[in-house]
Amino acid sequence: MSNRRFFIALSAALFAVLLLARLPASIATKLLPPSVSVSTSSGSIWEGSAAHVQVQLNGKWFALGRVDWELHPFGILVGDAVTIRSKWGSQHIDVSAGVTLSGEIRVSNAAIHTDIGWVKTLLPLFIAGDLNADIEELRITASGLPAVLTGRIVWENAAWQAVGGDVSLGTYVVDIATDESGISGRVMTLKGALELTGEFGLKGDAYSVAANLSGAAARNEAFQQAIALLAVPTESGYRIDLSGTL
């Protein structure tokens, strides 16, 4: 009798999954919060696309453009529930993500190329350039703190936006790893007018940042005024030492 109940329950579960898979994508888009705007969706909840998607960040809209998605129902248990691909002009984002039963957010195999200008919607940083990120793994705890982060971020054609005109900085790479001491990263200069070397660390909610700045851009008056509250002068340029909690 127990085997019969098991097969009945399994059949019911499979039927529910198949029924869900056939639901149109428009059903899913109607369940999204107001901070996500979707137009012209097609396909199914299981695998579909939207002609244009934008999300609200700090009261401003960030365009994702065309978005395609594919659900992985068996990946829900391990935090790999969906693959998302978006394209908006030269901007593209490919990512696999999910939420574990414990509430941890997991991101893997993320490839991102975008104009870094969107950072200004989150932080008061007047910067420009192109951001390329290859994130192997990112885990964010249920409390919202990063627990694991591995990957590489490249900031190309970096510039500081000043009233008198942009200050060209260069191209920089950040290599990020995670071990028992927490998340750590190293910043290196590939080329440019600002020589930047540094490192950062994050464990729990405690962070530290240390960096040295030198080169022609470090002698630019507008740039010096911009970093005056963060950096102290040295013989070769400037030094930044920050620490605190998120």
Region spans (language model):
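Outer-membrane beta-barrel architecture
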Residues: P146-T150, S208
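N-terminal beta-strand/beta-hairpin edge segment
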Residues: V38-L125, D130-N132
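Membrane-embedded beta-strand positions in outer-membrane beta-barrel channels/transporters
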Residues: D94, D130-N132, E137, V173, ...
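Flexible, membrane-facing loop/turn or short amphipathic-helix motifs
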Residues: H52-A63, S90-A97, I112-L125, E137-L145, ...
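Aromatic-capped interface at the extracytoplasmic side
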Residues: F15-T40
